[in-house]
């Protein structure tokens, strides 16, 4: 069984390993404390000698004089205590050099260990110290005043401390009493100098403040403080960039098609463009209509919706389009109501918004009337009663409404001969509605239902589709694979249309057409009918009397037929259940023009020298995409869920991390697996090659980073070591430019640094890493990017982050379906950004292509891939006017023409 523990690998063994590791860390801490105490005693003796000299009339060094730190003292003058890998503030206070009140970048000096006000925690969840005295020269130990009795009692007193914290408290007290140095300075005067924002907010807050001495910035996520040290080259935060970046994004291409779980999703417009939808975007694709796409095709996008589009209908004029969206919530948790947009496909301008506040959950099906040039629109929502309503298209006024059925409604349509006849079908039913209104007065229409009777024929579980024939009969396709012909009775056929008696339809013929359900029916211009099967994946053309004329089979890897649309001449467009859009005919077969994933996406990486990128996700497919040709280069079945990937700097191989702890190295040309390794049994969340290609880092949910040395352009690897110290699963990591160090984030908001070349050692003094340069910046926590976090963040609001290769902008993927663009570095709280909509689910990843010409973003549940063109300084083409920090795109600003 997967994940079963072998001998000696059970929970007891893991617990023993954890305890042993903790013991080793504590022993190291004791050595550090002993060394610090010895150095403190030596400095006290030096201080005593200085006092003696002063008493003898010899002048001692002043505060402004230059005194070097004794060689035994570390540059930061303070050991960092690290327990179980979590980050703990220094027990000895850091005091920088004197300077302007902005920032000071000299190395910190030692001070007595004062305590912060109640409620302030260190980065790892323990109490932290914070200096309150005036600044002094770097590296100088200065005495502090004894603690006054009137001060606030200790935060970690024995009465309120947990057993695990007491040894550390005793250790600190012992150090203070032995050296008489670590005295608490908690006077009212010193506390008055603290920033009032230094206390953390409540759960789910994101508050930040600057250390008064200018060494660090602290922000809070879920009440936990995260300390980030300011690089020495930054003298003042005021010199950092402010405002949104000059670069902007323009949606270039959308990969994918929503065929897995939707219907009424594929049509051909009068212009020849194919219209379909995915996520919140309605795509207008022109086969062969322009440079760049498969067969020279191009895309335009209607982006007026605020949540996922569920259905489409095309007006009889072939220009106007109606699209219905589902309900959702915005970033503040407020509900977004389902609505129908009627828009012009030539200008992409919204003409009418219908039903705001009238529908529940979402819009399930739409249809324009045909007999009166599309004057009316019928809508079925996704409420429990599946309300059927009729609307005046030009005025957006509801004319009639009625409860349809408690069962699912999958299709709706007007009779092309008579707008008073409406048909709905779905779970175990087909209903024929007579609309007695039609004068256009609001609410004057009545809808009367007559249920279809199956009689001697077996009643199917579902009737997913139907089509009207030129003679007025109706064909329905059902879950049994049958096509039923419904004809009107003789008396009703003589009845004039509007205002006459109810029309009665009965089954007059049945033909077994497919094995399994029939998902789509399409009436062709020559009067023949096409049917698309689910299980058998067959397309069949039917003549009069339901005689089969011709058929073709869709390849299995494309899935079953979901929708059929007739193109130019004999050309057909077919949408499939595996989110592919095929183009061809029954004689020559079909080839894909649009392809996509079918389940949640997480893994994304871009090629180091080409405009190509690779994706993987829960559908177990690994796909390499050509960003220039907007096409799928190749795909393969991983057999397991892929969660992360990265190209070797040579581009010859790519590594893919799976949800079982396995990782694969594949040749990008042959797709051959050249390496198959397993590290632990937890999922892998990040894989990253060093910039020189000599190391590979694997971040796992078992809290460890596995390091491998790499040779032969990535085809060979061997275990080099493990980075152990995080207290939660690894979420992000980056390599330094020299390939020797790693910065990593974890699930409990840690920022740790590792010396890989030195033996995968944890760098306990994080202050020393403040000036290190990073080859990539994908960690979501760090000084250079902390400004991207919104107020009130709970720590999960940002899923992915990527700095451009030119180090000018940062792209952010958030949990509210948005892609943001910030200036880099982004080290100001509440930094403004350019915000872009389109995804219908949390955005899981963003990456820039090798030359920063494109940005690729992944949707989670919507399985969409967006390719954005980066415009701005130095790029061709006008930059679209996108407001910064727009709460939601207005219809005008959301159109990408």
Swiss-Prot record:
InterPro entries: Beta-prop_EML-like_2nd (IPR055442), Beta-prop_EML_1st (IPR055439), HELP (IPR005108), Quinoprotein_ADH-like_sf (IPR011047), WD40/YVTN_repeat-like_dom_sf (IPR015943), WD40_repeat_dom_sf (IPR036322), WD40_rpt (IPR001680), WD_repeat_EMAP (IPR050630). CDD domains: TD_EMAP3. Residues 96-108, 118-132, 155-164 have a biased composition (Low complexity). Residues 51-68, 175-190, 883-897 have a biased composition (Polar residues). The modification Phosphoserine is found at residues 177, 199, 205, 884. Keywords: Acetylation, Cell cycle, Cell division, Coiled coil, Cytoplasm, Cytoskeleton, Microtubule, Mitosis, Nucleus, Phosphoprotein, Repeat, WD repeat. The modification N-acetylmethionine is found at residue 1. Residues 16-43 form a coiled coil. Phosphorylation at Thr-882 during mitosis is required for interaction with TUBG1, HAUS1, HAUS2, HAUS3, HAUS4, HAUS5, HAUS6, HAUS7 and HAUS8 and their recruitment to spindle microtubules. Belongs to the WD repeat EMAP family. This is Echinoderm microtubule-associated protein-like 3.
């Amino acid at each position: 069984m997967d994940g079963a523990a072998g001998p000696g690998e059970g929970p007891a063994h893991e617990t023993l390993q954890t305890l042993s590791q903790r013991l080793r860390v504590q022993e190291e801490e004791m050595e550090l404390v002993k060394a610090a105490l010895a150095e403190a005693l030596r400095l006290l003796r030096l201080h005593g000698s200085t006092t003696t000299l002063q008493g003898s009339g010899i002048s001692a060094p002043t505060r402004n004089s230059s005194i070097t730190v004794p060689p035994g003292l570390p540059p930061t003058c303070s050991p960092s205590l690290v327990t179980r890998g979590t980050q703990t503030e220094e027990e000895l206070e850091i005091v920088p050099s004197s300077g302007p009140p902005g920032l000071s970048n000299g190395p910190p000096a030692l001070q007595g260990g004062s305590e912060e006000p109640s409620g302030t925690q260190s980065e790892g969840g323990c109490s932290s110290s914070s200096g309150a005295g005036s600044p002094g020269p770097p590296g100088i130990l200065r005495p502090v005043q004894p603690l006054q009795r009137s001060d606030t009692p200790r935060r970690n007193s024995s009465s309120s401390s947990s057993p695990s914290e007491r040894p550390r408290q005793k250790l600190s007290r012992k150090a203070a009493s032995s050296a008489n140095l670590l005295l608490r300075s908690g006077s009212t005067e010193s506390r008055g100098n603290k920033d009032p924002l230094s206390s953390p907010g409540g759960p789910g807050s994101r508050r930040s403040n600057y250390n008064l001495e200018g060494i660090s910035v602290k922000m809070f996520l879920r009440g936990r403080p995260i300390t980030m040290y300011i690089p020495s080259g930054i003298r003042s935060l005021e010199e950092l960039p402010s405002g949104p970046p000059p670069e902007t994004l323009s949606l270039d291409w959308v990969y994918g098609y929503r065929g897995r779980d939707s219907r009424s999703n594929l049509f051909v417009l009068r212009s020849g463009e194919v219209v379909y939808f995915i996520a919140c975007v309605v795509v207008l694709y022109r086969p062969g209509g322009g440079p760049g796409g498969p067969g020279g095709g191009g895309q335009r996008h209607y982006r007026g919706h605020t949540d996922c589009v569920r259905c489409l209908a095309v007006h009889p004029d072939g220009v106007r389009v109606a699209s219905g969206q589902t309900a959702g919530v915005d970033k503040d948790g407020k509900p977004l109501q389902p609505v129908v947009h009627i828009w012009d496909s030539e200008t992409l301008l919204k003409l009418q918004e219908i039903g705001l506040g009238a529908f529940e959950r979402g819009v399930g099906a739409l249809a324009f009337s045909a007999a009166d040039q599309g004057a009316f629109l019928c809508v079925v929502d996704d409420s429990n009663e599946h309300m059927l309503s009729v609307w005046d298209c030009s005025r957006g006024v509801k004319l009639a409404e009625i409860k349809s059925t408690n069962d699912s409604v999958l299709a709706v349509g007007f009779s092309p001969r008579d707008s008073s006849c409406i048909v709905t079908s779905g779970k175990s039913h087909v209903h024929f509605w007579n609309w007695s209104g039609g004068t256009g007065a609001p609410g004057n229409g009545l809808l009367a239902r007559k249920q279809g009777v199956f009689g001697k024929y077996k009643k199917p579980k579902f009737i997913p589709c139907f089509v009207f024939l030129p003679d007025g009969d109706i064909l329905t396709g059902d879950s049994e694979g049958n096509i039923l012909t419904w004809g009107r009775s003789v008396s009703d056929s003589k009845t004039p249309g509007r205002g006459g008696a109810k029309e009665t339809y009965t089954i007059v013929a049945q033909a077994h057409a497919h094995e399994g359900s029939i998902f789509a029916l399409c009436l062709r211009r020559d009067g023949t009918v096409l049917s698309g099967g689910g299980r058998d994946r067959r397309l069949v053309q039917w003549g009069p009397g339901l005689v089969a004329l011709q058929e073709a089979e869709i390849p299995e890897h494309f899935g079953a037929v979901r929708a059929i649309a007739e193109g130019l001449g004999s050309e057909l467009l077919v949408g499939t259940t595996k989110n592919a859009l095929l183009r061809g005919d029954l004689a020559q077969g079909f080839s894909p023009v649009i392809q996509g994933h079918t389940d949640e996406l997480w893994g994304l990486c871009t090629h180091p020298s080409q405009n190509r990128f690779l994706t993987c996700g829960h559908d177990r497919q690994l796909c390499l995409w050509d960003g220039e040709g907007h096409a799928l280069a190749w795909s393969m079945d991983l057999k397991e869920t892929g969660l992360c990937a990265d190209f070797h700097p040579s581009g010859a191989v790519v590594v893919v991390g799976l949800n079982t702890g396995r990782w694969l190295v594949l040749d990008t040309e042959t797709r051959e697996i050249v390496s198959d390794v397993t590290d632990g049994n937890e999922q892998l969340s990040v894989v990253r090659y060093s910039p020189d290609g000599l190391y590979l880092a694997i971040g796992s949910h078992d809290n460890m980073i596995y390091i491998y040395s790499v040779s032969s352009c990535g085809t060979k690897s061997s275990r080099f070591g493990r980075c152990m110290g995080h207290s939660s699963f690894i979420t992000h990591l980056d390599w330094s430019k020299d390939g020797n160090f790693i910065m990593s984030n974890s699930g409990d908001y840690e920022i740790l640094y590792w010396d890989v070349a030195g033996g995968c050692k944890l760098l306990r003094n994080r202050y020393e890493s403040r000036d290190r340069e990073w080859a990539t910046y994908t960690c979501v926590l760090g000084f250079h990017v902390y400004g991207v976090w919104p107020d009130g963040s709970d720590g999960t609001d940002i899923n992915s982050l990527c700095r451009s290769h030119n180090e000018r902008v940062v792209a952010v993927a958030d949990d509210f379906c948005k892609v943001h663009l910030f200036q880099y570095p982004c080290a100001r709280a509440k930094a403004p950004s350019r915000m872009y909509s389109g995804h219908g689910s949390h955005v899981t990843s963003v990456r820039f292509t090798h030359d920063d010409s494109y940005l690729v973003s992944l949707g989670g549940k919507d399985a969409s891939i967006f390719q954005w063109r980066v415009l701005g300084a130095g790029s061709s083409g006008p930059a679209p006017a996108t407001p910064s920090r727009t709460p939601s795109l207005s219809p005008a600003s959301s159109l990408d023409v």
